[in-house]
Amino acid sequence: MSSTRIPVIALLAAAGRGTRLGGPIPKAFVTLRERTLLERSLQAMLTSESVDEIIILVSPDMETYARDLLRKRGLLNDPEGVRVRLVHGGGERADSVWAGLQAISLDDATPDAIVLIHDSARALTPPGMIARVVRKVHEGATAVIPVLPVSDTIKRVSPDGGVVVDTPNRAELRAVQTPQGFLLSELVAANEKFFADPNPGFIPTDDASLMEWYGADVVCVQGDPMAFKVTTPIDMMLAQRITDEAEPTIFEVPGD
């Protein structure tokens, strides 16, 4: 649990269907070496010793399954002193996050509370990286994202994907990961504005892009290659190889 008086609340997105992974069940519940991606992501949050509450966003049809699974694993009922609960997510990621934010009792949270938004599919995220994001918000940032340099050349293409428009300077590009950290009051305000606008002009692909749209400065911290998103069968093969060879060391770190 966070030792500071400012509460840190994590929203763990687990409502997606995961169609690109190709399995019969939602991606968060796919098993990686006898533990689901959701369990692994939840354990990383607990091991980081940075959060006071974790809200897991699940689709309504998976709530009972998720509750039974987490109860069996001892991950409900305040494991390690951290409150863990389930909330129904929405049809799109932005809808799920908004549902999670609305589930936070603002009466219990101080105006400067911190919220983390994390993808359960980033199941091997090191706890130290989670702590790094939280620390940066504690230091005064409104919005924080973990990033990595890109190794591939990136092309911007025409809407039909057939013609290259230009080549951005790779030195200025970063791959963005989660968890992303925010001041709770600012992220709530950005979501209120977005969902109240019948034509916001864009679809947020992550919460940082919503904060950019809202006008907030988004600060970068160092990401970690282990925080990759398990999206395709190849990603799952990589995750299996890593856990086969390095399972005992994956969750060793709280700090950095």
Curated annotation (Swiss-Prot):
It catalyses: 2-C-methyl-D-erythritol 4-phosphate + CTP + H(+) = 4-CDP-2-C-methyl-D-erythritol + diphosphate. It is an enzyme of class 2 (transferase). GO terms for molecular function: 2-C-methyl-D-erythritol 4-phosphate cytidylyltransferase activity. It holds the Pfam family IspD. Keywords: Isoprene biosynthesis, Nucleotidyltransferase, Transferase. It comes from the Bacteria. Pathway: Isoprenoid biosynthesis; isopentenyl diphosphate biosynthesis via DXP pathway; isopentenyl diphosphate from 1-deoxy-D-xylulose 5-phosphate: step 2/6. Catalyzes the formation of 4-diphosphocytidyl-2-C-methyl-D-erythritol from CTP and 2-C-methyl-D-erythritol 4-phosphate (MEP). Belongs to the IspD/TarI cytidylyltransferase family. IspD subfamily. This is 2-C-methyl-D-erythritol 4-phosphate cytidylyltransferase. It comes from Corynebacterium glutamicum (strain ATCC 13032 / DSM 20300 / JCM 1318 / BCRC 11384 / CCUG 27702 / LMG 3730 / NBRC 12168 / NCIMB 10025 / NRRL B-2784 / 534).
